[in-house]
From Swiss-Prot:
NDH-1 shuttles electrons from NADH, via FMN and iron-sulfur (Fe-S) centers, to quinones in the respiratory chain. The immediate electron acceptor for the enzyme in this species is believed to be ubiquinone. Couples the redox reaction to proton translocation (for every two electrons transferred, four hydrogen ions are translocated across the cytoplasmic membrane), and thus conserves the redox energy in a proton gradient. GO terms for cellular component: plasma membrane. It is found in: Cell inner membrane. Keywords: Cell inner membrane, Cell membrane, Membrane, NAD, Quinone, Translocase, Transport, Ubiquinone. It comes from the Bacteria. InterPro entries: NADH_Q_OxRdtase_suD, NADH_UbQ_OxRdtase_49kDa_CS, NDH1_su_D/H, NiFe-Hase_large. One of its GO terms (molecular function) is NAD binding. The gene is nuoD. This is NADH-quinone oxidoreductase subunit D.
């Protein structure tokens, strides 16, 4: 009998692969069709964000957060603003809190629509992305009408938001909600009930409760395994404790469960949006949209054009910026991808001493090797799609 020396086959997956979701490069070690090892190579989109923030004032550093998870930009700004507000003890007016929560939920819809439909495309369905992008376009227009930008909004500011929402926009967001629920139902029927989609996703990339905790997962990745952990319920920030919504939880911890949870989260987000719209219309929802403390919130532009004092005030805040008391703080939000945290260290000057960004996608990608081991090559794109990775935040 002759001895055969069997050597595993190594291939590159990405960074120009349509299912790589950006600039991911995976070096796969294959034994036939079976994946033996996955080696993610990251850093192709590294821009040194954390270091750049140290050279900018707090107000100038906010736009960097739009460029992390650029699929749902406002959710990242939120964490940074919360960190500054905790350190400086800034009181955020109620109307600003409602607007923030409303746009964070719009961001969640933007992210989940992209993820669920592109993951369906990765396994061979062509219709869902077209439907999903049609709805995303409407939501992008809401972003544009609120902040003037479709993508990099720079709308959340320390102490509140940049400008108020016009009443017509609030009406249009209200009118968007119910028809959107029908689209979610159509997507559910088309994708989640599809036999082929189930065959490709059920029992793939299973994560148990203990494993989810050990890997440091958050967001949908832990909820898919059956842990009802959602920062909006567990550690409510802004006005989330007033909102009524459910936290969907999976039971098998596979890629199919995680996608079903994302579909249900979209319905819950619409519930929160409707409550925000109703509260914004009430008399209690009227009032200022930024902190009334002039040390932190610049005057509105229309006032700046009329008053010399407002112009000086505006100029001072945008050039020198405000000084934040010495200290360190961690602020986290339930971003669409998971727990997005900002660890901010202040030395009492007008610039952050250190700003550590805890990106959920980074923690999820490290488990790629462990999740894919023993699966077939075709399952790699299913697992990758369900991790919901955007490289802006992984590479920072």
């Amino acid at each position: 009998m002759t001895e055969h020396n069997i050597r595993n086959f190594a291939i590159n997956f990405g960074p120009q692969h349509p299912a790589a979701h950006g600039v991911l490069r995976l070096v796969l070690e294959l034994d036939g069709e079976v994946v033996e090892r996955v080696d993610p190579h990251i850093g192709l989109l590294h821009r040194g964000t954390e270091k750049l923030i140290e050279y900018k004032t707090y107000l100038q550093a906010t736009p960097y957060f739009d460029r992390l998870d650029y699929v749902s930009p406002m959710n990242q700004e939120h964490a940074f603003c919360l960190a500054i507000e905790k350190l400086a003890g800034i009181e955020v007016p109620r109307r600003a809190q409602l607007i923030r929560v409303l746009f964070c939920e719009i961001g969640r819809l933007l992210s989940h629509l992209l993820n669920v439909t592109t993951q369906a495309m990765d396994v061979g369905a062509l219709t869902p992305p077209l439907w999903g992008f049609e709805e995303r376009e409407k939501l992008m227009i809401f972003y544009e009408r609120a902040s003037g930008a479709r993508l990099h909004a720079n709308y959340f500011r320390p102490g509140g938001v940049h400008q108020d929402l016009p009443p017509k926009l609030i009406d249009d967001i209200d009118a968007f909600c119910d028809p959107f629920l029908q689209v979610v139902q159509d997507l559910d029927d088309l994708v989640m009930a599809n036999r082929i989609f189930k065959q490709r996703n059920v029992d793939i990339g299973i994560v148990s409760v203990d494993e989810a905790m050990q890997w440091g997962f958050s967001g949908v990745m832990v909820r898919g395994s059956g842990i009802p952990w959602d920062l909006r319920k567990a550690q409510p920030y802004e006005c989330y404790e007033e909102m009524e919504f459910d936290v969907p939880v999976g039971k098998n911890g596979d890629t199919y469960d995680r996608q079903v949870i994302r579909m249900e989260e979209m319905r819950q987000s619409v519930r929160i949006m409707k409550q925000c719209v109703a509260k914004l219309r009430e008399p209690a929802g009227q009032g200022p949209i930024a902190s009334v403390d002039g040390k932190f919130a610049p005057p509105p532009r229309r006032e700046m054009k009329r008053s010399m004092e407002a112009l000086i005030h505006h100029f001072k805040l945008y050039t020198e910026g405000f000084h934040v008391p010495e200290g360190e703080v961690y602020a986290a939000v339930e971003a669409p991808k998971g727990e997005f945290g900002v660890y901010l260290v202040s030395d009492g000057t007008n610039k952050p001493y250190r700003c550590k960004i805890r990106a959920p996608g980074f923690a999820h990608l490290q488990a790629m090797d462990w999740m894919c081991r023993g699966h077939l090559l075709a399952d790699v794109s299913c697992v990758l799609g369900t991790l919901d990775i955007v490289f802006g935040e992984v590479d920072r």
